[in-house]
UniProtKB/Swiss-Prot annotation:
It is found in: Cytoplasm. Catalyzes the formation of S-adenosylmethionine (AdoMet) from methionine and ATP. The overall synthetic reaction is composed of two sequential steps, AdoMet formation and the subsequent tripolyphosphate hydrolysis which occurs prior to release of AdoMet from the enzyme. GO terms for biological process: one-carbon metabolic process; S-adenosylmethionine biosynthetic process. Keywords: ATP-binding, Cytoplasm, Magnesium, Metal-binding, Nucleotide-binding, One-carbon metabolism, Potassium, Transferase. ATP binds at residues 14, 164-166, 242-243, 251, 257-258, 274, 278. Mg(2+) binds at residue 16. This is S-adenosylmethionine synthase. The keyword rRNA-binding does not apply. Belongs to the AdoMet synthase family.
Amino acid sequence: MAYLFTSESVSEGHPDKIADQISDALLDNFLAFDGESKVACETMVTTGQVVLAGEVRSNTYLDVQNIARDVINDIGYTKGAYKFSGDSCGVISLIHEQSQDIYQGVDRGNKEEQGAGDQGMMFGYATNETENYMPLALDISHKILIELAKLRREGKEIEYLRPDSKSQVTIEYSDENVPERIVAIVVSTQHDDFDADDEKMLTKIKKDIIEILIPRVKKQLPEYVQKLFNDDIVYHINPTGKFVIGGPHGDAGLTGRKIIVDTYGGKGAHGGGAFSGKDPSKVDRSAAYASRHIAKNLVAAGVAPEILVQVSYAIGVVEPTSISVYTYGKNNTDLSDGQIAEKVKEIFDMRPSSIEDRLKLRNPIYRETAAYGHMGKEPRKVTKIFESPYKGKITREVELFTWEKLDYVDKVKDAFELN
């Protein structure tokens, strides 16, 4: 019998995502000026206020208030009517030095002996149902909001959009786990109060989302996904009605509260650790990226159409306590999942320092991860500029989303004799 699966996304202007982006912007600035910085930055945003907290060990000092304000303005919170704007909000910093007890357990004279920054389990997932090896419902949900943000910034076809928005997509699957049709799409978008008649205002918003936004999204998708769109899709557009009050004025936002949006939309699994604001010594982040890298390369190499990788660590310990692989009963090799995991250990070095080196994680690459998902994006090289009142301006060339590279496919094929 066919079944339904749903995933959601939230925009860069969602309160929790504002917090994530501020935390990762702070992390990037610390790493830009001191690549060995140890950082754990948390952010809370609410009406007219930003609170920064956490622990840092670094040889650089930053104007953290201005970094936070720049992020808020970049997102689009620039008007007093929003009750939260980069130029006028208060920014309180409670950031202090990292605990010596934690530092001594993680840091080693020999980098290869670097211990894990915490205990825990991390997961990486990949599926061949999309070109970027991501779950389809989540991929479409992200694309809806990315395009909505473009429309907001363009300010031409839809002029009333504000930064806060959410999306959700429900897809019907066959018994063979093949997507057959899109059943429902939910879009909630903050907007200006542009009409005294609330019913007329909502009617226009619905019309614009269905007739302007959705066709723009659909054009970006491969033909087999476009065919899933149909005349029977149920659209829920701003289903509560008016959505003028939004952003941090409508709901407080915190770093690390959108971990499913950040990863696989409910597919696969999640170990519970959030990513944003954490330097790569925190395996919550680095090992989750490395596990995605493994899963994606395994699927791309043809080991299985869908793969889940789990890795676990003990704080201060160099080697993982476990590595496992789950192929959902669709393994294309003659090996058991346990045997596949043993080969994975031979191919991928999962010591924290090796992950950092392999994926180039000690670079300022994290602000771009903090909205619309940490996984599934195209690896690319960019030039970034950072400025400190104490050290001046520097330029850094970095590579983003290295864990999305298919650079181990040949090694996997050789190891599993899939050539």
